[in-house]
Amino acid sequence: MNFKELGIDQDIVDALESRGITSPFPIQEQAIPLALTGQDIIGQAKTGTGKTLGFGLPTIQRVVGRDDDQWGSLQKPGAPQALILVPTRELAIQVGNDLSVASKLRNARVATLYGGVPYEPQVEQLTKGLEVVVGTPGRLIDLYQHGALTLTQVRTVVLD
């Protein structure tokens, strides 16, 4: 089985292959087809078994990017459409990096938001527009309470 057979778009497959990722792990084979349809899923697997791409690839594929036909029909183009909550800064960075690799050939912009770093560059990322937010609860709550993070367009939420 390969990612294309799971329903992943060719641009994402190409981005993965450019990094040597060609075959899905078992958790990905189980999760991806369900997640692509928008179903709620719960996945559990050991560290290093591919959970991030199991939820991340469908998330990237399901958002509407700047060059997509549906972009103009969005209520607020550039507002986040997917929110991925992670418990630590380190995991936020890892998940953000993995999703950035997968979205390299796609119009899905990914921002990684967490505390312990300057606030303003993260607000600037949100202002410029993006499709996927990966972040820690504390920083996301802060950005939301200050009006920098809009959640009205979020249709995918992941708790990692």
Region annotations inferred by a language model:
Residues 2-160:
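SF2 DExD/H RNA helicase N-terminal ATP-binding lobe
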